[in-house]
Amino acid sequence: MAAAAQSRVVRVLSMSRSAITAIATSVCHGPPRRQLHHALIPHGKGGRSSVSGIVATVFGATGFLGRYVVNHLGRMGSQVIIPYRCDTYDIMHLRPMGDLGQLLFLEWDARDKDSIRRVVQHSNVVINLIGRDWETRNFDFEDVFVKIPQAIAQLSKEAGVEKFIHVSHLNANIKSSSRYLRNKAVGEKVVRDAFPEAIIIKPSDIFGREDRFLNSFASMHRFGPTPLGSLGWKTVKQPVYVVDVSKGIVNAVKDPDANGKSFAFVGPNRYLLFHLVKYIFAVAHRLFLPFPLPLFAYRWVARVFEISPFEPWITRDKVERMHITDMKLPHLPGLEDLGIQATPLELKAIEVLRRHRTYRWLSAEIEDVKPAKTVNI
């Protein structure tokens, strides 16, 4: 009897093993592989994993405009050399903008020609975005806008660079009251002399998430009333969106007919400074209390910020630039000639100004704010 019971146990165990094997086989056995036909494989741009043939050195890539230019170059499969002088942690945000090994970071010295030569010698495109809103003990406006661009242009020409793009300013003028804009004008001339085929980009004031244009005006609410020379009734501004500028620069790289030309990048609308600042405060849901401050008094206030040990909120030169009307340059090609439709300020202002709202108005609809009044002067 014991033997019979033992045989039944063995039989049950053997059946259990076979059942387990069958179940495991049925679970692990997946569906048959789908047979792909070449016609079914999606075609199109390869994105960051493609190869555009562009090897670009971008000076000033760690700045406001630079991050957008690097991103647009990276997303089309370009190899980008990024010279930097800052801490390595300040360039971390650029690393995901290109495929593995496509972004090369090299330390450089702006006053060392061998250092400049090293970062441009293997490139077919060089883009100069170097800029500074205020002068320091180490670099004044002449260094930043004249001497350094001249050296980069000369060494790029010697290295056989095919395209050189230099970013200036719409209001660059040798007779300007702004030292910033005077040196921008001289910089254009020395770059053109050193690299005759250079493409010069002349944008107006650029706005975007990290700008010093909309954010600067919006932060005035901390001081109570908003000082404006002549209340802003004598100044006209035509700001341009940072993404449009970066796309225009990249399209100029790809355009064989752009060599040797100057481009004026402006937004689609012109505004009186008063109406523009009023709109900025309306989007930020802040009380707008303008008061006329004579420019000589405004410069005196700016001088106080200049001598502080912190980053200056405003400088005397910025006061001048703030109250200079944006030029109209109809003889120069613009964004439209490079296939870019300029973005109105009203579509993107909320992206920049939402952080200036109080919690009560954080999610308020932008439709409740009237668009800024435009002018045609």
UniProtKB/Swiss-Prot annotation:
Transit peptide endpoints, chain numbering: 1-35
PTMs per UniProt: Acetylated on lysine residues. BLOC1S1 is required for acetylation. Acetylated by CLOCK in a circadian manner.
Cofactor descriptive note: Binds 1 FAD per subunit.
Family matches, as InterPro entries: ComplexI_NDUFA9_subunit, Epimerase_deHydtase, NAD(P)-bd_dom_sf
MF-aspect GO terms: NADH dehydrogenase activity; protein-containing complex binding
Modified residues (N6-succinyllysine): 175
UniProt-annotated location(s): Mitochondrion matrix
GO terms, biological process: circadian rhythm
Recorded coiled-coil stretches: none
N6-acetyllysine modification, residue list: 189, 370
Family per record: Belongs to the complex I NDUFA9 subunit family.
Task performed by this protein: Accessory subunit of the mitochondrial membrane respiratory chain NADH dehydrogenase (Complex I), that is believed not to be involved in catalysis. Complex I functions in the transfer of electrons from NADH to the respiratory chain. The immediate electron acceptor for the enzyme is believed to be ubiquinone.
Subunit structure: Complex I is composed of 45 different subunits. This a component of the hydrophobic protein fraction. Interacts with BLOC1S1. Interacts with SLC2A4. Interacts with CLOCK. Interacts with RAB5IF.
Protein's name according to its UniProt entry: NADH dehydrogenase [ubiquinone] 1 alpha subcomplex subunit 9, mitochondrial
Source organism of this protein record: Pongo abelii
